[in-house]
UniProtKB/Swiss-Prot annotation:
Single GO biological process annotation from the record: 'de novo' pyrimidine nucleobase biosynthetic process
UniProt keyword Transferase, yes or no: no
PANTHER family referenced in this protein's UniProt entry, alphabetically: DIHYDROOROTATE DEHYDROGENASE (QUINONE), MITOCHONDRIAL, DIHYDROOROTATE DEHYDROGENASE (QUINONE), MITOCHONDRIAL-RELATED
Biological source species: Pectobacterium carotovorum subsp. carotovorum (strain PC1)
Gene behind this protein: pyrD
Protein name per Swiss-Prot or TrEMBL: Dihydroorotate dehydrogenase (quinone)
Keyword list, A-Z: Cell membrane, Flavoprotein, FMN, Membrane, Oxidoreductase, Pyrimidine biosynthesis
Chain residues that bind substrate: K66, N111, R112, M113, G114, F115, N172, N177, N246, T247
Pfam families for this protein: DHO_dh (PF01180)
Topological category with respect to the lipid bilayer: Peripheral membrane protein
Annotated family: Belongs to the dihydroorotate dehydrogenase family. Type 2 subfamily.
GO MF annotation list: dihydroorotate dehydrogenase (quinone) activity
Biological function: Catalyzes the conversion of dihydroorotate to orotate with quinone as electron acceptor.
């Protein structure tokens, strides 16, 4: 109800400053009786995916709550699941500012944040305090200064630390803002990483006596051949799910608009069609062998339904949430 007024004020500010101010307020009310200020009631729409029970199929995508500081306040808005992160083994400040830009006319965002986060240990401490009743995903990545050849070690360190606290673990190999990261999506590098992750998952299952599914997050900027190879690798290594997609480097839909020349990943409405097409092609290739979590430009109920019609079992929002607020959650969950 109040979001249009709040949004108008926030959109006068630098995007990252607006984010910081919003999270400052959410941190203040999280785990307090004042959570009622953001709480909204949504119907239960149970979904089973990756062996987990979701109270509804709508989640918050990774990147908004990188350090898991506002899980309960965000959960109160009605998300069926929340994905925190991307988190890395060691804290890192990310890329130089400014690094987040609004493409207002297109309801898009461009970011080159660079995995800024307080490190996996800090995230785990925050996760331990949460009372969120939905599924919690933890998205993990590699530190910028870790050579790509040793990148898998960073994922294994993070897995070791988050496993006991995660509903599922998301492997981010598709951010365009960490040099060389996307190369892990291809060929031997991908097979090597997935083998190491599955071995670690088996080891941690024995140690903790519980199975935590692993999903891999992929880019939208993939050729037909690359997509076929990725699908084949995911199936061969028995990965539990795939998150499609991350942000795009493509700018054709925002040519001539403010900030269109900024480097970084583009999200929001300009990503909607291409991410849905990747989901459709991926769904055909996977033929039901593993589930797809659809994300990219969902800004309405219709956009969410399109992702599910293309083959997604669950969907996530981020940019659409920034532009439309908590009402978008209620609209999607109520009518999906």
């Amino acid at each position: 109800m109040f979001y249009p007024v709040i949004k108008k004020a926030l959109f006068q500010l630098d995007p990252e400053r607006a984010h910081e101010l919003t999270f400052q307020q959410l941190r203040r009310i999280t785990n307090t009786p004042f959570e009622f200020l953001v709480r909204q009631s949504v119907p239960t729409k149970p979904v089973t995916c990756m062996g987990l029970s979701f109270k509804n199929p709508l989640g918050l995508a990774a990147g908004l709550d990188k350090d898991g500081e506002c899980i309960d306040a965000l959960g109160a808005m009605g998300f069926g699941f929340i994905e925190v992160g991307t988190v890395t083994p060691r804290p890192q400040s990310g890329n130089d500012k400014p690094r987040l830009f609004r493409v207002v006319e297109a309801e898009g965002l461009i970011n080159r944040m660079g995995f800024n986060n307080k490190g996996v240990d800090s995230l785990v401490e925050n996760v331990k305090k949460t009372r969120f009743g939905g599924v919690l995903g933890i998205n993990i990545g590699k530190n910028k200064d870790t050579p790509v050849e040793q990148g898998k070690d960073d994922y294994l360190i993070c897995m070791d630390k988050v496993y006991a606290h995660a509903g599922y673990i998301a492997i981010n190999i598709s951010s365009p803002n960490t040099p060389g990261l996307r190369s892990l999506q291809y060929g031997e590098a991908l097979d090597d990483l997935l083998l190491a992750i599955k071995n670690k998952q088996a080891e941690l299952k024995e140690r903790h006596q519980k199975y935590v599914p692993v999903a891999v997050k992929i880019a939208p900027d993939l050729s037909e051949e690359e997509l076929i190879q990725i699908a084949d690798s995911l199936v061969r290594h028995n990965i539990d799910g795939v998150i499609a997609t991350n942000t795009t480097l493509d700018r054709k839909l925002i040519q001539g608009l403010n900030h269109c020349g900024q480097t970084g990943g583009l999200s929001g409405r300009p990503l909607q069609t291409s991410s849905t097409e990747i989901i459709r092609r991926l769904s055909q290739e996977l033929a039901g062998r593993l589930p797809i979590i659809g994300v990219g430009g969902i800004d309405s109920l219709v956009a969410a339904r399109e992702k599910m019609a293309a083959g997604a079992s669950l969907v996530q929002i981020y940019s659409g949430f920034i532009f439309h607020g908590p009402r978008l959650i209620k609209d999607i969950v109520t009518h999906i």
